């Protein structure tokens, strides 16, 4: 049976686009919905061109997230993937999708995780601290920023020329 996933992004959506492309021909996983809290995101055009449903998350209120939860349920979403999504997921969604919300984080957690640690902020901190190794972590989402169980980590050796 095909698992339906929703992708959430706040920026330009490069990870969301890549994940969508990767699963485009999959018989096991279908990208059903892409959501963003950024009305200027190029993801909305991407969704139109690729016949993927999209949703603008208009705010970060309880009502906004309740609407989002209802949309997930109506769309029969099995898993939610956070692809550079900057808003904290509320407990109502976390408890409904326990161990079914996955985050992609740009460091080897627990280093450089937590509130405010995302995107270029993480990379700058890694370079400032003269780290020799960095990488990514894929983990389940729980109530605390970047504290969910780790699913996968991939190390990357940094060169001295990286800035």
Predicted feature residues:
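One-carbon transfer enzymes
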Residues: 1-163
């Amino acid at each position: 049976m095909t698992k339906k996933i929703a992708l959430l992004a706040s920026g330009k959506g490069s990870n969301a686009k890549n994940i969508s492309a990767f699963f485009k021909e999959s018989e096991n996983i279908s990208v059903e919905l892409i959501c963003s809290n950024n009305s200027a995101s190029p993801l909305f055009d991407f969704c139109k061109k690729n016949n993927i449903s999209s949703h603008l998350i208009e705010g970060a209120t309880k009502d906004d997230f309740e609407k989002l939860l209802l949309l997930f349920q109506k769309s029969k979403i099995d898993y939610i993937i956070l692809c550079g999504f900057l808003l904290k997921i509320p407990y109502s969604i976390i408890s409904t999708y326990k161990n079914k919300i996955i985050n992609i984080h740009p460091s080897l957690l627990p280093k450089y995780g937590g509130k405010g640690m995302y995107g270029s902020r993480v990379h700058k901190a890694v370079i400032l601290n003269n780290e020799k190794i960095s990488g990514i972590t894929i983990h389940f989402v729980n109530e605390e920023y970047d504290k969910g169980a780790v699913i996968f980590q991939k190390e990357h050796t940094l060169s001295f020329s990286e800035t």
